[in-house]
Regions:
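Phosphate/pyrophosphate-binding loops at sites that engage ATP/ADP/AMP, CoA/4′-phosphopantetheine
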Residues: 70-77, 103-117, 136-137
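N-terminal extracellular/periplasmic Venus flytrap/periplasmic-binding protein-like
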Residues: 1-72, 135, 140-142
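Beta-strand segments within the central parallel beta-sheet cores of soluble alpha/beta enzyme folds
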Residues: 3-10, 75-86, 114-123, 142-148, ...
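Structural signal for hydrophobic packing residues in well-ordered secondary-structure cores
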Residues: 12, 38-41, 85, 106-109, ...
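Short glycine/threonine-rich loop-to-helix capping motif typified by GTGT followed
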Residues: 16-21, 91-98, 123-141, 155-160, ...
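Active-site pocket-shaping loop/turn-to-helix segments
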Residues: 25, 44-60, 82-108, 121, ...
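Alpha-helical scaffold segments in soluble metabolic enzymes
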Residues: 33-36, 101-104, 108, 131, ...
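Conserved beta-strand-centric core segments of catalytic alpha/beta enzyme folds
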Residues: 48-65, 160-198
Length: 198
């Protein structure tokens, strides 16, 4: 992720502190350690700190501009926004908002899911992410190929820009054409966007 991170230097009394690495990933995590974690919300529940996205800080920016404006400013676009959509579902299935949002975005674009080369589907919780993946029929090989929010974190204020950036960099890395970025939003909403590599 180094190419996606702009290092921030903070001057302290002890000297410079450089923020240039995502601190959320835990490379030493094991299945055994995850299996021992206690449920977070209900005594007999299945959601634990190991299968839920982390609560962490983050910042991201994502510039959307008309191609001619970008060219005049001397910038080369990474991609073109093909379509986007928002949708809502009943509160009791609030994590499934990406399902209708994705279907609407695909329909607006005149594209199908199998045309997507990269899919970033934000993971609030494993159960939520699995439900979205199952209902939409997401290809596991194309979905969150470099880790999702459970592994990398879910800095709420920047998650949309964060996962869109990840998708575009991966699209360029593999030489793909289209990517889908989708996430649930509190209260039953979902959002999805489709980009085409420039």
């Amino acid at each position: 992720f180094k190419s996606q991170i702009l290092p921030i230097v903070k001057q302290t009394r002890k000297g410079e502190v450089i923020f240039d690495t995502d601190e959320h990933p835990r490379p030493g995590t094991t299945l055994e350690a995850l299996a021992k974690m206690r449920p977070a919300f209900k005594k007999d529940g299945t959601v634990t700190a190991g299968n839920a996205s982390g609560i962490n800080d983050g910042a991201a920016f994502f510039v959307l501009a008309a191609a001619d404006v970008a060219a005049k400013a001397g910038h080369q676009p990474m991609a073109r926004l093909v379509s986007y959509a928002v949708a809502g579902v009943p509160n009791d299935v609030m994590g499934e908002g990406p399902i209708p949002a994705t279907r609407k975005a695909l329909a607006k674009a005149g594209l199908s899911l199998d045309q997507m080369d990269v899919i970033e589907s934000n993971e609030a919780f494993a159960a939520q992410a699995l439900s979205v993946a199952k209902v939409l029929g997401l290809d596991p090989a194309k979905t969150n190929p470099n880790g999702g929010a459970i592994a990398l974190g879910h800095p709420v204020g920047c998650s949309g820009a964060f996962i869109a950036t990840k998708a575009l960099y991966e699209l360029q890395r593999i030489g793909g054409k289209y990517c889908l970025v989708t996430m649930c939003i509190g209260g039953g909403q979902g959002i999805a966007a489709i980009f085409e590599r420039a």
